[in-house]
C-alpha cells in the first residue's frame, strides 16, 4: 500500500508538469475566477500530492524557518485551523496578527504594518468579509504595500497573500469543496453533465458573511 502511494504521488507530480502555472509564482491567490483552468488544476494537483505525502508519512517540510501571518477580521474555526495546519505542514510557524494589540491602533498605516510583519514572512492569509467593497480592496492594498517594499529593497522576499475570505469570494473554501466533490464522484471528468444543488441556510442569530 505504501509503494502504491508513492507510485500515485509520482504520477500526480508528472501530471503537474503538464500544467502551465508559471504566473502563480511570486503572485497572490485572491479570487478563483482570476485563475486559469491550468492554474486551478495545478492547485488541485498540489493539494493531492501533499495529501498523498502526508498519508505516506513523507515529510512535506519546505522551510527550515519563516512565518505564516494570519489576519482574521472576522471569526473563524475551520479556515483558521486549516491555514495553521498548512503552514505547519510546510515548516512555517504561524503568527496571528491581533490588530487591537498592534501599532495599528496608534495610527500605523497599512503600508507600514504590511512591511513590518513581512520581514520573515513567506505567506500572509487574510480574512476580511464583513463590508461590501472593503475586504478584497484591503487585501490588494496589503499586496501592493509588500510589492513596493520588495521592489525598494525593504523586504528581501515578497510574501504571497492568500484570501481566507473576503466580501466577494471564499477562495479556500470553494477550492476545498470543489476538490472534495471531484474526489467523491471519481474525477473531474465525471462532473460533466451533472447538476449540483446548493442550499442557503439563514438564521437571525448568525451574521452570514457576504461572500
Regions found by a protein language model. Give the residues of each.
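Hydrophobic beta-strand scaffold residues
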Residues: 94-96, 124, 161
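Active-site-adjacent beta->alpha loops and helix N-cap segments on the catalytic face
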Residues: 132-143
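Active-site cofactor/substrate anionic-group-binding motifs, chiefly glycine-
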Residues: 67-120
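Glycine-rich phosphate/diphosphate-binding loop of Rossmann-like nucleotide-binding domains
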Residues: 73-88, 178, 182-211
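Positively charged, low-complexity intrinsically disordered leader regions
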Residues: 2-81, 85
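A glycine-rich helix N-cap at a beta->alpha junction
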Residues: 119-131
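A glycine-rich, Thr/Ser-enriched phosphate-binding loop motif common to dinucleotide/cofactor-binding enzymes
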Residues: 138, 161-181
Amino acid at each position: 500500500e505504501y509503494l502504491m502511494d508513492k507510485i500515485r504521488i509520482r504520477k500526480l507530480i508528472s501530471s503537474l508538469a503538464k500544467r502551465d502555472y508559471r504566473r502563480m509564482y511570486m503572485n497572490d491567490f485572491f479570487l478563483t475566477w482570476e485563475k486559469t483552468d491550468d492554474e486551478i488544476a495545478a492547485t488541485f494537483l498540489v493539494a493531492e500530492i501533499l495529501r498523498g505525502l502526508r498519508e505516506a508519512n513523507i515529510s512535506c517540510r519546505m522551510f527550515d524557518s519563516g512565518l505564516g501571518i494570519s489576519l482574521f477580521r472576522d471569526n473563524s474555526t475551520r479556515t483558521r485551523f486549516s491555514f495553521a495546519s498548512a503552514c505547519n505542514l510546510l515548516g512555517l510557524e504561524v503568527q496571528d496578527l491581533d490588530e487591537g494589540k498592534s501599532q495599528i491602533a496608534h495610527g500605523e498605516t497599512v503600508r507600514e504594518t504590511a512591511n513590518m510583519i513581512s520581514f520573515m514572512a513567506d505567506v500572509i492569509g487574510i480574512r476580511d468579509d464583513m463590508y461590501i467593497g472593503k475586504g478584497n480592496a484591503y487585501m490588494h492594498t496589503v499586496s501592493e504595500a509588500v510589492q513596493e517594499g520588495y521592489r525598494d529593497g525593504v523586504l528581501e522576499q515578497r510574501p504571497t497573500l492568500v484570501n481566507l475570505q473576503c466580501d466577494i469570494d471564499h477562495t479556500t473554501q470553494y477550492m476545498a469543496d470543489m476538490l472534495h466533490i471531484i474526489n467523491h464522484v471519481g474525477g473531474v471528468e465525471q462532473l460533466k453533465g451533472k447538476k449540483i444543488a446548493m442550499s442557503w441556510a439563514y438564521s437571525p442569530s448568525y451574521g452570514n458573511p457576504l461572500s
